Amino acid sequence: MAPKAEKKPAEKKPVEEKAEKKPKAEKRVPGAKEGGGEKKGKKKAKKSVETYKIYIFKVLKQVHPDIGISSKAMSIMNSFINDIFEKLAQEAARLARYNKKPTITSREIQTSVRLVLPGELAKHAVSEGTKAVTKFTSS
C-alpha cells in the first residue's frame, strides 16, 4: 500500500485581507429570478385543455336564448361529446381496418355515424355532416 501524503495545515490569511469591505448587494427586481438554468421573467407554461364548452354554450343560445347552464351540467355535456366522438373514431378506425385502408375518410365517418347513433338522430347527423363537408370543399 502506498504511503499516505502528509497533510499540511491550512495557511491563515493576513487580517488585512479580511478587513476589506465587500461591495453592497444589488437591489433585485421583484419577480425576476436568477437561478441555475432558469430564464429571466419566464413563467411556467399553462397546460392547455381542450373543451367544447364554448360551442355547447353557443348552441344552447341558438336553441334557447333565455336559458343558462350550470358548470356541472356543462361538464357533463362536455364528457358526453367526448364519449360520442371517441365511439365514432373507434368505429371509423375499425371500418378502415376491415377494408384495409390506411386513411379514415368522410365515408368511414358517415358509416360509423349510421352504426353508432340510433335512427332519426343518425339521419340528421349524416345530413348535417354532408352539408358541412360540401361547404368546406366548395370554399
UniProtKB/Swiss-Prot annotation:
Q: Which Pfam families match?
A: Histone
What are the boundaries of the region Disordered?
Answer: 1-47
- Keyword S-adenosyl-L-methionine carried by entry: no
Report one GO cellular component.
nucleosome
Q: Which family does it belong to?
A: Belongs to the histone H2B family.
What is the protein name given in its UniProt record? Histone H2B.11
Write down the SMART domains for this protein, in alphabetical order: H2B (SM00427)
Mark the residues carrying the PTM N6-acetyllysine. K7, K27
Q: Name one GO molecular function term.
A: DNA binding
Its gene name is H2B.11
Ranges of biased composition (kind: Basic and acidic residues): 1-39
What does the function comment of this entry state? Answer: Core component of nucleosome. Nucleosomes wrap and compact DNA into chromatin, limiting DNA accessibility to the cellular machineries which require DNA as a template. Histones thereby play a central role in transcription regulation, DNA repair, DNA replication and chromosomal stability. DNA accessibility is regulated via a complex set of post-translational modifications of histones, also called histone code, and nucleosome remodeling.
Processing after translation: Can be acetylated to form H2BK6ac and H2BK33ac. Monoubiquitinated by BRE1 to form H2BK143ub1 and deubiquitinated by UBP26. Required for heterochromatic histone H3 di- and trimethylation at H3K4me. May give a specific tag for epigenetic transcriptional activation.
Matches recorded under CDD domains: HFD_H2B
Glycyl lysine isopeptide (Lys-Gly) (interchain with G-Cter in ubiquitin) cross-link: located at K135
List each coiled-coil range.
none
Query: How is this protein organized at the quaternary level?
Result: The nucleosome is a histone octamer containing two molecules each of H2A, H2B, H3 and H4 assembled in one H3-H4 heterotetramer and two H2A-H2B heterodimers. The octamer wraps approximately 147 bp of DNA.
